[in-house]
């Protein structure tokens, strides 16, 4: 869907040496981009930063985003590198926002602007003030307006059920802590728009 041909390396154990070996194998395979998931935060088993630094650099490793704060970007040797968060929803969101556009640009493809829509919110939404991408369900009403509500019981970054039940990510801009019912919001479609 993004335009890339995947060269799967498999799963590395949580050691700097094994992660470095995987990076070397990717480099030797002649890939144009290295992508990893997990191991980019600051926990006891997060060794990606150390592995990259042996033959590369990290340009940034955090973004002010929910979900998806631990996101790394840099180079391994001369190859661009993205390190996605380990939580599945965080990984999904950061892939859509950062990695997919990079792959499409590298392939000479254009991002599809029709995936961004405006909708009317059907429930109040609270946020912590960070730019947030909340799992939502969007539908087209008989009057032609698009309406959206949150999907799933909570927005935790490990909640896959909410992601499966959603067809859109509801975008809460940075600095916004609450949105009332009826507020006009931006959406990023991740599935098909449904009818009411």
Language-model segments: what does each one mean?
Residues 31-48, 85:
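Glycine-rich beta-strand-to-loop/alpha-helix junction loops that act as flexible
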Residues 4, 11-14, 39-40, 57, ...:
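Short, ordered loop/turn segments at secondary-structure junctions
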Residues 19, 42-45, 91-92:
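Short glycine/serine/threonine-rich phosphate/pyrophosphate-binding segments
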Residues 53-196:
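Flexible glycine/proline-rich
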Residues 11, 36-37, 83, 94:
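Small/polar loops that bind or transfer phosphate-bearing groups
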Residues 1-36:
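Phosphate-binding glycine-rich loops and their immediate beta-loop-alpha structural context
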Residues 27, 46, 63:
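Catalytic core of soluble alpha/beta enzymes
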């Amino acid at each position: 869907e993004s335009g890339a041909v995947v060269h799967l390396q498999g799963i590395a154990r949580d050691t700097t040496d094994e992660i470095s070996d995987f990076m070397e194998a990717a480099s030797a395979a002649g890939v144009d981009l290295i992508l990893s998931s997990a191991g980019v935060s600051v926990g006891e088993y997060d060794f990606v930063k150390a592995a990259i630094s042996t033959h590369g650099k990290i340009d940034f490793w955090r973004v002010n985003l929910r979900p998806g704060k631990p996101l790394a970007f840099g180079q391994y040797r001369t190859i661009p590198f993205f390190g996605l968060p380990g939580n599945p929803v965080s990984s999904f969101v950061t892939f859509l926002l950062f990695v997919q556009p990079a792959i499409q640009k590298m392939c000479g493809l254009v991002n599809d602007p029709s995936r961004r829509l405006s909708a009317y919110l059907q429930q109040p939404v609270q946020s912590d003030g960070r730019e947030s991408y909340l799992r939502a369900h969007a539908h087209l009403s008989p009057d032609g307006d698009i309406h959206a509500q949150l999907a799933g019981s909570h927005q935790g970054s490990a909640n896959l059920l909410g992601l499966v039940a959603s067809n859109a990510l509801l975008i809460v801009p940075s600095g916004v802590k609450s949105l009332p019912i009826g507020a006009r919001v931006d959406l990023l479609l991740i599935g098909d728009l449904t009818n009411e």
